A protein has these predicted regions:
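Short, intrinsically disordered N-terminal pre-domain segments
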Residues: 1-17, 26, 470-472
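Short hydrophobic/aromatic-rich beta-strand motifs
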Residues: 17-24, 318-320
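Short, surface-exposed terminal/edge motifs of secreted or surface/virion proteins that either
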Residues: 22-40
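Acidic glycine-/aspartate-rich tracts in secreted/extracellular proteins
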Residues: 24-28, 52, 121-123, 160-162, ...
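GGW-centered surface loops in extracellular recognition modules
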Residues: 40-117, 124-125
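Short aromatic-cysteine micro-motif
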Residues: 108-112, 138-322
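C-terminal, surface-exposed recognition/capping segments
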Residues: 251-285, 306, 326-334, 361-472
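Extracytoplasmic, non-cytosolic globular domains
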Residues: 310-337, 349
Length: 472
């Protein structure tokens, strides 16, 4: 290597990838320090959407270097996570392997097969006269903004979880034994085309799912709302698109950023209703060998005696099949039906492992009131309330499956009573499904063949109340 004089060095544009060499006198170690930690200028990146513009596509803002590498810096991808929240990264190219080498045990013996991030970060949502913004910052909160703290966390990497029928635990595993039989645990189907071995567990009420999730220990959840909110927000920020069902585009834009979405969602079998009785039809092992892949997957199933290719399975850095397959009723969202045939969303701000009361809105935080309905059906709002890490459509209609947020909200047009919030959409939901799809028609005690659960966990308890960061 040739010697270079200091005065001959070119200047650098400081960004998320700029580091200094530092020495820790106490530890006796030399390492890299992000310039932002020294300068106080935290890297942040996000997207903005023009008010009044119906396009779901946003514009990038902030540090483009961070935008190009956000998934890598957050550590998005597959992990093995123990009940004690110790996580081991899986190989980015094949989840059958550990990142460090060697085979990965996804059957439950070494932990849960999860997807998530391995560093905490901060999320900001705000607006000015012209734009609505969603941004994330690394290393600390953004000064001059309300900040939401997001701890290290994860969810079922296969999209949904299985039930350990022996121990009544909700687990993220890929296991074909009877102990983890999916669906409603119907043993009579074993060996048939519609066997539920290695399938997601379904047809359980959310109260049963969340109780089974907590059998893993503290800070384990089922269909926890913040996990879905942040997954959706990261997709919007990384893709720059509110329509996650947009066609996948492997080509980066002129700024080196992702664009498009991960497609409409999974295909259906020939007779999901008559032959499958609406139970799961794609195994939990789909896409494992693709690692932290982003794009579209496919698999082949025995469709009542015929080999059928099931395509359009979405994958987001290894998170598979997380919308338009099985509904997932949230364990900590509650809808109050109003006299004018609208609904109001309530949540709990404490993500500490306690179980939110699903029989009363007393003591809960009101998020917002949705649109009025003349009759039960799907509605599309122009704007969404994004508050306390919860989402809900605002009152003004005028959106569609290709404009604004693009996802549907099913309003039962009921005038009283409480309802649960069923998220993600089902395989029959078509273009109404997606990251902020919400069906508000079912009682919280409801359970059907096409309702499942994604297992969630966080490394620490936190609140969904934002904190203001004072400017220097």
């Amino acid at each position: 290597m040739e010697k270079t004089l200091m005065r001959e060095l070119e200047g650098l544009n400081v960004g998320a990838n700029t580091y200094l060499l530092g020495y820790d006198t106490k530890a006796g170690k030399t390492g890299l320090i992000a310039v932002s930690q020294v300068s106080g200028s935290l890297p942040w990146f996000g997207r903005k959407w023009a008010k009044g513009n119906s396009s779901p596509v946003g514009s990038p803002v902030g540090d483009f270097d961070l935008g190009q590498t956000l998934a890598k810096q957050l550590g998005l991808g597959g992990y093995l996570v123990t009940d004690a929240h110790v996580r081991t990264k899986l190989s980015a190219s094949n989840h059958n392997l550990l990142e460090s080498g060697g085979a990965a045990d996804l059957t439950g013996g070494a932990g849960h097969y999860q997807w998530g991030w391995n560093v905490p970060f901060y999320y900001q949502v705000y607006e000015d006269d012209n734009y609505l913004y969603e941004t994330v910052s690394l290393g600390g909160p953004r000064p001059g903004f309300w900040n939401y703290y997001i701890p290290v966390g994860s969810r079922s990497c296969a999209g949904y979880a299985a039930m350990d029928r022996t121990n009544s635990k909700l687990m993220s595993v890929v296991n074909s034994t009877a102990q983890f039989r999916g669906g409603n645990n119907d043993a009579s189907l074993d060996g048939l085309f519609n066997s539920q071995l290695c399938m997601p567990a379904t047809n359980m009420a959310i109260s049963a799912f969340r109780t089974a999730a907590r059998k893993n220990g503290t800070l384990w959840f089922a269909n926890e709302r913040v996990m879905q909110y942040i997954t959706a927000a990261l997709k919007r920020i990384i893709f720059g698109n509110r329509n996650i069902q947009a066609t996948f585009n492997a080509t980066l834009d002129t700024n080196g950023l992702r664009q498009g979405g991960t497609g409409v969602g999974i295909d259906q079998p020939t007779a999901w209703a008559d032959a499958w009785k609406y139970y799961p039809y794609v195994k939990l092992n789909v896409g494992i060998d693709q690692g932290d892949f982003t794009g579209i997957l496919n698999t082949t199933i025995n469709d009542n005696g015929t080999q059928k290719t099931i395509g359009n399975i979405p994958s987001f850095y290894g998170l598979k099949n997380d919308y338009k397959y099985l509904y997932a009723m949230s364990e900590n969202m509650l809808l109050q039906c109003n006299a004018d045939k609208s609904q109001t969303l309530y949540v709990s701000d404490n993500i500490d492992g306690s179980q939110m009361n699903l029989s009363s809105v007393a003591g809960l935080t009101q998020i917002g009131k949705g649109p009025v309905a003349s009759a039960a059906g799907w509605q599309y709002a122009k704007e969404y309330t994004l508050k306390n890490l919860a989402f809900f459509p605002k009152e003004e209609l005028g959106g569609s499956t290709s404009t604004y947020f693009c996802d549907g909200y099913y309003n039962p047009a009921a005038t009283s009573g409480l309802r649960g919030a069923a998220l993600l959409g089902g395989a029959l939901s078509g273009v109404a499904a997606g990251s902020v799809c919400l069906d508000g028609s079912a009682a919280v005690s409801g359970a059907t063949a096409y309702w499942g659960a994604f297992l969630c966990e966080y490394a620490e308890a936190f609140t969904t109340q934002p904190v203001w960061c004072v400017e220097d």
